[in-house]
Structure formats: C-alpha cells, structure tokens
Amino acid sequence: MTQRRVAITGIEVLAPGGLGRKEFWQLLSEGRTATRGITFFDPAPFRSKVAAEADFCGLENGLSPQEVRRMDRAAQFAVVTARAVEDSGAELAAHPPHRIGVVVGSAVGATMGLDNEYRVVSDGGRLDLVDHRYAVPHLYNYLVPSSFAAEVAWAVGAEGPSTVVSTGCTSGIDAVGIAVELVREGSVDVMVAGAVDAPISPIPCVLDAIKATTPRHDAPATASRPFDSTRNGFVLGEGAAFFVLEELHSARRRGAHIYAEIAGYATRSNAYHMTGLRDGAEMAEAIRLALDEARLNPEQVDYINAHGSGTKQNDRHETAAFKKALGEHAYRTPVSSIKSMVGHSLGAIGSIEIAASALAMEYDVVPPTANLHTPDPECDLDYVPLTARDQRVDSVLTVGSGFGGFQSAMVLTSAQRSTV
C-alpha cells in the first residue's frame, strides 16, 4: 500500500520582530535580532534580564474583548496564528468537520496568565492565603494546556482529533510530526498543527536558577550567540507557528501552493538526565530515522536548521550528533540557529524553525547564525555566521533537543521541484 504523502499548504508565524511569515522571513534573511531588555515584569532579581518579546495586541489582531479576557497570551497567539488556514486557500467547509484535526505543542502552558492571576488573588503576593473571590471564571483555561487545542479547534471548526503535545523544547516538532502521521494514515483530510508558548514571566525565568539563560544584558541584541566561544546561555523568547497539512496529491489537484513536503520525522529520548546530555547518539539516531523515512541519503541534506540554543553543552552535543548522523557531509552542510535572532520560545520554537525551514526552500536562502564571531573550536561546522547565504535548498533537516532527554528530527523536501 502506497503511503500518503503530506504537504504544508499554509504557514503563519508570530515571532519577536513581527507578526506574519513575511515579516518573520525578512528579519531572518537580514540577520536582525529581536532581543531587548525585559519589559513584561521587573527582571531585577534575575541574572538574565533580556528576552525576545513579541509586539502583540489581541484586539489589534482580530480578537474580540471577550476572547482577550478569556484567553492567556499564549492562547491568543495560537488562535491568531491558526490563520494559516487562510494562507492555504483550503476550503475547510468542503470537508466534514470530523475530518479536520488540530495538534498544538506547548512546553509550559499558560504561565503568563497563571502569574497574572496569582498576583490578583494574592494581592501581589502579600496575602498569606489567596482570596479565591478575585479569581476569574476562566482560570481553569490557564490550568490546562488542552485549552490551546480547544481554542484553535473552535476557531477553525475542527471536530476531528484534537490534542496537545508537551515534550519540552521538542514540542513544536513533535506536534507537527504527530499531525503528519494522522494525515498519512487517512484518519483526517486536513490538520491544523503547530506550537505556541509565551513564557516571558517570572515562572519560566526559574531557568535562570540553573544558569540556562544568558546573564549578558549590557548589549541585548548580541546576547544570543549559538556556537560562539563566548556564549553563556539562551535568550528566552515567545511566539507561535501553525501550518495547514494536507495529503500531497489532493493539494496538487486543487492547485494549492505547496511550501514543502514533510518527508520524514522521528523522535528519541536519552533516558539519562533531565538537563544533561551525553555524546549526541540519541539525536543522531533520530536524524538517521527521519532521513530513512524521507528516503534521503546524508549527502542529500542541503541545510540543517539546528536547535542551537546557545548553551555550552547543547551546541557541542548537536555538533557531535550531526557528525555521527551525516559523516563527512556534516562538514559540507550549512547549519544555522535562528534562536540567535528570535530567542528560544521553548515549546513553540520547533514549529517556528519548521516555518523557517520551509521558507528557506521557498526563497533558496539559508538564514544566518547572528552574533557568531568566534566559533567554539568544538563547534567546527559551517554555521553560516552573521549573513544569510543564497543557495539552492531542496531539503532541510530541522532538529530539536528538550529537557528530559527528548531528541526530535524532521526532514522537509521541496515538493515544488518534485514531479513524483
């Protein structure tokens, strides 16, 4: 039985630096950074005082006052970004609602909403006991990440499978990977899938306590510097990216614009440590499995969209994994980290990086690694420093690594240049 192939026919992105895939791509292709001093709360108690904040107002982006009151910032991101349906040109009304599904990835859920509500019911933390009378009726929405999938399903009229994936920083890749499998097996006709996180609040800033985030704040624009010898942690970001996924031949029949085919996906875990990483073997295995599913040889990978968080450990771990999986071709393949420009939005970043990968093929441009001036000697691959590179891109490997040992890989190929 021939396996159904899955295409991306719609993309929408909300990221630091702009709402919309065009603004997002312009920032990446120009190598600009969106990092600044934190404005959402007073960061004085924390080592890290910079973040990549998104300029966003729900009311200015089509949400009603009632929706803004009901939804946490992350849920608002998800609903607005689910407008990828519009980009796809897909007539969802032509499909039975139960043949349309939703998968949303998120690492930390509605942390900003929870933090705000705690401040209200505790009088800014001054009360020994919280006063539940001040709790908003929709507080439950903040407590359950499943509300993200529910809000997106309501927004697009999906009555098929609807679920949330929470695998730390690989959530965005895993959410799309699971959605691809549902289309492949014929359970649905269309999936709206992606990931979201809005973690810039004191709650996720406890990452500061384990020194995962950078303390560099004297020059915010240069704070995120993956693979550089002076890197000292990542910059927290926020955002969302969502996709419309359809069976490839069906999308071609209706004349859809096809950004990419998702040809391979795999995930592994190291069963080792919550934050520690070993020698890259598990990520390398995920890469090999994704390439096998895509029926690609290592030599056919044109670009690697790295996890590239900017921690000493992760960047070296990834470099080792690429060498294990691709062999000598790793040295000939451009690798870059867009976290150098848009920060690390935890569960959302995997989907944001999938969007960047698809757009790299759309425009035949490899985005750069910003702020890479002095490469770490142990990170000795081609990390596309500072400036984007024009080159033909027919296939992209994008990878993610998450706390808990999660390692995921996805292969995108150019369906536009394939007649199969």
From Swiss-Prot:
Pfam families: ketoacyl-synt, Ketoacyl-synt_C. It is an enzyme of class 2 (transferase). GO terms for biological process: antibiotic biosynthetic process; fatty acid biosynthetic process. GO terms for molecular function: 3-oxoacyl-[acyl-carrier-protein] synthase activity. GO terms for cellular component: cytosol. Residues 3-414 form the Ketosynthase family 3 (KS3) domain. Its EC number is 2.3.1.-. It comes from the Bacteria. Keywords: Acyltransferase, Antibiotic biosynthesis, Transferase. Pathway: Antifungal biosynthesis; monensin biosynthesis. This is Putative polyketide beta-ketoacyl synthase 1. It comes from Streptomyces virginiae (Streptomyces cinnamonensis).
